[in-house]
From Swiss-Prot:
Chain positions listed as propeptide in the UniProt record: 20-51
Keywords, sorted A to Z: Cleavage on pair of basic residues, Disulfide bond, Neurotoxin, Secreted, Signal, Toxin
Signal peptide start and end residues: 1-19
Role according to the record: Shows a paralytic effect in fish.
InterPro entries from the UniProt entry: Conotoxin
More details: Found in injectable (milked) (IV) venom.
Pfam families: Conotoxin
Lineage: Eukaryota, Metazoa, Spiralia, Lophotrochozoa, Mollusca
The name this protein goes by in its record: Conotoxin CnIIIF
Keyword Protein biosynthesis (UniProt): no
Length: 73
């Protein structure tokens, strides 16, 4: 029984130290850079400026956060 207790103690001590990331290893959330990487619907190759929607057969308009989007974009 003592061998099982020693093994359990070792596992409980080693697992959290190696499995959980440290604060320095976590990446920083940069929402401004994410916004620059997003392509606007006007620049999307499938966007039809005249219809303000994507090509034929697209179910338009859909709205997300007060912005009109297409189902294909």
């Amino acid at each position: 029984m003592s061998k099982l207790g020693v093994l359990l103690t070792i596992c409980l001590l080693l697992f959290p130290l190696t499995a959980l990331p440290m604060d320095g290893d976590q990446s920083v959330d940069r929402p401004a850079e994410r916004m620059q990487d997003d392509i606007s619907s006007g620049q999307h190759p499938l966007f039809n400026q005249k219809r303000r929607c994507c090509g034929e057969g697209a179910s338009c308009p859909r709205y997300f956060r007060n912005s009109q989007i297409c189902s294909c974009c």
